Structures are given as structure tokens and as C-alpha cells.
Amino acid sequence: MERNIWHHNIRKYVILIKAGLIALLIVAGLWCAEYQNRWQSRMDNAQELMQDLRKQDAEALFPKLWQDARCFPVRSSDSTQQNGGTQWENGGSRQSGGTQQENSGLRQRGGSQQNGSLSKSWGFDDGYGEGRSYGGSRRHEGIDIMAVDAGAGELEVQSVSDGTVEQMGWLELGGYRVGIRSPGGLYFYYAHLDSYAAGLQKGDTVKAGTLLGYMGDTGYGQEGTRGKFPVHLHFGVYYDKNGEEKTIDPYRLLRCLETKL
């Protein structure tokens, strides 16, 4: 009798162990598939980014972008992680700024940022080159990352790259903005901020992931103008070509950086 019970228990444990191993293999398979999909997505976007640069006769920019740009410009909910040995700031105080989106609505790509118990999100699509009318007919020189379920001053904006704060302050079109010059010579432009990170000054050296300020709706008027458009971050990338400032479409770059969230 005891022998039968012992054999029964052994069979039960064997079944449990097999079930556990099968579950572990399934989880590992799903994780590998997700990792492969994210990596493949990043590679696909990198290839499309390079094709876009070829169209602009700017192939030399690709290695600079790939090396310099390391963070998505809007922080994710787990942005307290370590990045290259540098602790990303989270929350903290801010300094008041006293930075376009004319097509609002749901965006194709997006993410979220945890603010207390509420999840604040954003989204973006490829609006580079679209027409703009404020201040005269012109084309859009960047990508608008739109706030979804978040107000001005709620979403944190961080530096995409290491670099130096080259420009800071008010622009009629860009509102409160920050311009960062990267080690590779690229100029990353962040506009329509609600306010700046406390202590940030022109000439400061920053790291990828350094808090720059907070997403807002400033611009399109005299200093302090707000509310002329939905809350968003205008993100632009500029480079020098024979002494002339040029822009690139940063959509594919953002897609690549988005996979790092």
C-alpha cells in the first residue's frame, strides 16, 4: 500500500515538473520572440532611416545619429533606470520659462509615462514637411510628439544625446525651447516646453537622459503665449552642410529610439 502511494506521489511530482518545464519553455519562447521582433523593428527603421538620408544626400549623418541619439525624448514610466552609468533624474523641481501642431488627434505611435497613480501617454506620426501657416507659409521641420491624457507640464522631456545646451529661451514659433549640440555635431531641438528643469542653463553639459523640461503648449506669439495648440513636444534634428543648416525627418530615428523604451 505504501509502495503504491509512493509511486503515485512520484508520478505526480514528475507531471508537475514536466508542466513547469513546458511553461518555462513557453515563456522563454515568447520572450525571445518579443526581443527578436523589437530588434527586427529597430533594424527595419534603421534601414529606412538610412534610405531617407540617402534621399537627402546626407549618408554621413547615419553613423552620427546612430552613435549620438540614445534616448527617446519623452520619458517612459521606468525612466529612473541607469543609463550609461548616469542616473536619470525623475520629477524634481522646475524653473518657469518666463516653449506645433496644427493637426491634432490620435497618433500612430505612442507610449506612456507614469505620473503618480495616473498613466500619461503620448503619440506621434510622420508630420515632417507638412504645411504650416503661422508666420507665413512654411513646412514643418520636425515631428510633433502629442500628449494624450496629459496636460501642460505633466510629461518630462529629456535629452536624446550627450551634448551642450547651445540655445535656450523664447522663440515666437517655438515658445520655450532648448537646443542641444551633440558630440557628432548634430543639433537636437526641443520646442513648446511648458517650463525648464531647475538649474538648466545655456552652456551646460548634459548627458543622454538628462531632464530638460516639461511638455507644454507655448509659442506662436510674444513671450509667455500659451494654449494656441494642443500640448506637445516639437522635436527636430539639424545638421550643417557646407555652412548651411539643414533638417532631416526624425520620424525613423524616433521609431528606433522608441524600441529602447
PLM feature segments, named:
Residues 159-199, 226, 231:
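Zn2+-dependent peptidoglycan hydrolase active-site motif and core
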Residues 34-98, 102-176, 208, 221, ...:
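Surface-exposed, glycine-biased beta-strand/turn segments
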